[in-house]
């Protein structure tokens, strides 16, 4: 690792004009200390900062870069689309094609494009309320569904990184219809329905949680959620912004086979550009304007350049690619375990298919309380030792790590080498 002076200078400049110097809080390294690295370029499995340092990328832009950075075919598709026009404010064939691809690979019957995961979940909740005529929403402690006021209560990594129970600016009225229960506790969901009869529009859950660290649903949890919701006339919204087309060819739906009444998507379907979607049963989706009374719109929704990137990303994400990503996740998990075990550091490698994180305690964490109860103080030293040795991991203990299909044997050699001092640093942390 050479100097990071240029990153430090840019961070100082940014703090004069941008709150915290960043445009999304976790990028500020607030929970691990130090200063943000300013990235200049990326290619394949690597990131390159403004000081010329190279990093093996284990963040993948928080999930979208399944195929690696700047994949030449995706770049070419974006360039070609851009030459035809950047935005039209009118329908395009690309919107039709990507909708067909999403419907073909998931449980949804109809889909609408939006610009971000936050928009997708916000719109899905509004639609569920409009369809059922009910106001209340059940969400889970530690699950993050974007920075929608009503869903920021107990929202996991987005606020946990800064040790905030929720966000100032979210009024009591905004959160009054949000019921928060522990993740992986279907009986708590049942109790909430019994306490609020005929008031709950939907249950929203990450299909597999990735914002309290990585926490997989246990004991057919998603299926139980759907069963309880339907017993009480409510809908199940599965948030696949993170898991969709990341955890398998069919997203988390391909892992446990549970179809949400509504499902949200993002990240991989964007190819790295701003795009997301929500979809579901046709009878529900047809409550959206212009067919139905529930209003939702967006000037840049279905942007042709983003659609080109998303289509090419999905086209290239073949079953063989998922085999590679799964093998890479398994390999990384093995190296993490070996390094920490060698140093006698209590840990568990949390897994949800190809997503993973490190819990610094014995045994698997099943909810946000479990994840917070670990030795989280070990993570900053662990993270910085990796970073100093050229490995760019997620800069929060409550975030998920992502691998791409572009990782090489040489990358894994670098990871293995960097994990030795990182595990030692974690063991010495107090």
Curated annotation (Swiss-Prot):
Cellular component, GO annotation: cytoplasm
Subcellular localization: Cytoplasm
EC number(s) given by UniProt: 5.4.3.8
Top-level taxon in the UniProt lineage: Bacteria
Primary localization class, coarse: cytoplasm
Positions bearing N6-(pyridoxal phosphate)lysine: 267
InterPro entries for this protein: 4pyrrol_synth_GluAld_NH2Trfase, Aminotrans_3, Aminotrans_3_PPA_site, PyrdxlP-dep_Trfase, PyrdxlP-dep_Trfase_major, PyrdxlP-dep_Trfase_small
Pfam family, one: Aminotran_3
Keywords: Cytoplasm, Isomerase, Porphyrin biosynthesis, Pyridoxal phosphate
Enzymatic reactions: (S)-4-amino-5-oxopentanoate = 5-aminolevulinate
Gene3D superfamilies, per database record: Aspartate Aminotransferase, domain 1, Type I PLP-dependent aspartate aminotransferase-like (Major domain)
Family membership: Belongs to the class-III pyridoxal-phosphate-dependent aminotransferase family. HemL subfamily.
Protein name (Swiss-Prot/TrEMBL): Glutamate-1-semialdehyde 2,1-aminomutase
Source organism per UniProt: Corynebacterium diphtheriae (strain ATCC 700971 / NCTC 13129 / Biotype gravis)
Gene (UniProt): hemL
């Amino acid at each position: 690792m050479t100097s990071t002076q240029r990153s430090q200078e840019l961070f100082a400049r940014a703090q004069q004009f941008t709150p915290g110097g960043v445009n999304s809080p976790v990028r500020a390294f607030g929970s691990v200390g130090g200063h943000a690295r300013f990235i200049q370029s990326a290619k394949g499995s690597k990131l390159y900062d403004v000081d010329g340092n190279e990093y093996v990328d284990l963040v993948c832009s928080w999930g979208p870069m399944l195929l690696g950075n700047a994949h030449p075919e995706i770049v070419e598709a974006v360039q070609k689309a851009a030459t035809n026009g950047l935005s039209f404010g009118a329908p395009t064939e690309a919107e039709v094609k990507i909708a067909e691809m999403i419907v073909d690979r998931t449980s949804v019957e109809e889909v609408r494009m939006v610009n971000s995961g936050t928009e997708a979940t916000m719109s899905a909740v509004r639609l569920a309320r409009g369809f059922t005529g009910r106001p209340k929403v059940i969400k889970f402690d530690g699950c993050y569904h974007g920075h929608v006021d009503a869903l920021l209560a107990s929202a996991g990594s987005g606020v946990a990184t800064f040790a905030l129970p929720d966000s100032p600016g979210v009024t009591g009225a905004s959160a009054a219809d949000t019921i928060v229960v522990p993740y992986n506790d279907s009986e708590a969901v049942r109790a909430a329905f019994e306490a609020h009869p005929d008031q709950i529009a939907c249950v929203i859950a990450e299909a597999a949680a990735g914002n309290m660290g990585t926490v997989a649903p246990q004991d057919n949890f998603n299926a139980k959620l759907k069963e309880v919701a339907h017993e009480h006339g409510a809908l199940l919204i599965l948030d696949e912004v993170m898991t969709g087309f990341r955890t398998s060819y069919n997203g988390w739906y391909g892992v446990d086979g549970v179809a949400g009444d509504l499902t949200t998507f993002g990240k991989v379907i964007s190819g790295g550009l701003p795009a997301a979607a929500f979809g579901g049963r046709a009878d529900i989706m047809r409550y959206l304007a212009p067919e139905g009374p529930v209003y939702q719109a967006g000037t840049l929704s279905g942007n042709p350049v983003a659609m080109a990137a998303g289509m090419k990303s999905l086209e290239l994400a073949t079953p063989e690619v998922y085999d590679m990503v799964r093998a890479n996740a398994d390999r990384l998990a093995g190296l993490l375990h070996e390094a920490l075990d060698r140093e006698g550091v209590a840990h568990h490698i949390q897994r949800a298919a190809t997503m993973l994180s490190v819990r610094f305690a014995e045994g698997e964490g099943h909810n946000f309380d479990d994840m917070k109860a670990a030795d989280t103080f070990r993570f900053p030293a662990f993270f910085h030792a990796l970073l100093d040795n050229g490995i760019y991991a997620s800069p929060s203990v409550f975030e998920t790590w992502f691998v791409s299909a572009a990782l090489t044997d040489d990358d894994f050699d670098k990871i293995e080498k960097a994990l030795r001092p990182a595990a030692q640093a974690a063991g010495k942390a107090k």
